[in-house]
């Protein structure tokens, strides 16, 4: 058995004082009388005699049964025919075996448990120890505990070992970001980091949930240094009738009236026969920036990349990055001696930023063969353009480019939307078109497309930051059939969504994708699930635009928000 022990360390109080351990004193007869009872005291014989009896019984009955087994084989007697004495011997053998296994087996298992607990502290001798320093010096600053401690964290952190790690994190001896790798338990690491943060900041995190989340699922993928998770309510709008199918659309939001308004738009579309959608483009982009010694040399690269005869070779090099990546086009822009190369490729059911970046890196490495003087400044030169409002996305598109339209009956406009067609058409022209132009909007020719896009993105595990370009939308309204019907459409050139990777693998977001029927990758037609999700986003935006514009035209916007978007709590009583 491994008998190594951790060195004794001085215990510290919360104020940094050292608590000295008492030295062991000899055991007297009085101590033996008042000692705690042991489990072996319940045996009728002393422990060593009990062990001797069972050892003797085990080997004697084993010898007897083996002798009887040999006699039966010689006499051709069936082995299953047993006498009363043989039955007693079998029972004695089993009983003695169980006793010996229980007595010696527990000690054997405990030896491995003790060894594992000791070796866990010896994994990396080069890193700072979790234990408090032997010097007994007080920490550089006193640890002040907040009176309002988080009860759920205290319930999780119950061992002295956790307390030692917390003190090490607070004192800066152990980096907070390394807790997962050192401890090996993501939930425990989050609880320790959370408690250390509360002690450092002297602020309570009570109200931020810790329990009920799989912290293993976000390790190395979604979030670093977690201390909990934020709860956002998820509501359902719909059913949305789109391309002949009904969809219940999950929306995660804290804005009252948003889901109710979108739901009203879905109802108006459903009563009018549904909406239809068209996918115009499907291609993610990445644009590195490279530099040459002269503008002439930079133009040579531009001509080489845009030459159709070179596309097949470049495509073959690019597509090595993934079995789903397929290069669609290359667009170059020059600024002096710098070249911005915008690659566009399909990415299957993934949103595709990592996939296209790997393909771009393959092409850059390939180009170094013929362009030795090419200096790669960055894998992204903002000509992509990611997470920023940009004209290139508005004009050329990025991700999925979708158009969604519907024809709303005049009766539905009056009864459900509580307005009329002429008022909607006029408001759309003056607000969404002329008003946005006066404001100098870039892709913002709509009422509130980003509201719906953000809510669906959060619910389905998309990148919320890509709401910027994904919300590019122009809303059009026109009276048709002699003014009896309303034609409404939304054109969204850069919806960036995926159904695999990133936050889509989290349990809650995965459930919302499953509700829409687009969970995971489509095995039969790669990319079909992400394309369907993009059309659902556009259809939901269409419903939201229709309802909000109707509320504004009817003068109901302020009234509805006062009813659904105001808290009834007295905010003056909420503690800071």
From Swiss-Prot:
Tissue specificity statement from the Swiss-Prot or TrEMBL entry: Expressed in trichomes, leaves, flowers, roots and stems.
Cellular compartments annotated: Endoplasmic reticulum membrane; Plastid, Chloroplast membrane; Peroxisome membrane
TM regions (residue ranges): 42-62, 89-109, 532-552
Sample GO molecular function, one term: hydroxymethylglutaryl-CoA reductase (NADPH) activity
Gene Ontology, cellular component aspect: chloroplast membrane; endoplasmic reticulum membrane; peroxisomal membrane
Pathway(s) per entry: Metabolic intermediate biosynthesis; (R)-mevalonate biosynthesis; (R)-mevalonate from acetyl-CoA: step 3/3
UniProt-recorded name of the protein: 3-hydroxy-3-methylglutaryl coenzyme A reductase 1
List of catalytic residues: 255, 387, 463, 561
Lineage summary: Eukaryota, Viridiplantae, Streptophyta, Embryophyta, Tracheophyta
Membrane topology: Multi-pass membrane protein
UniProt-listed PANTHER family: 3-HYDROXY-3-METHYLGLUTARYL-COENZYME A REDUCTASE
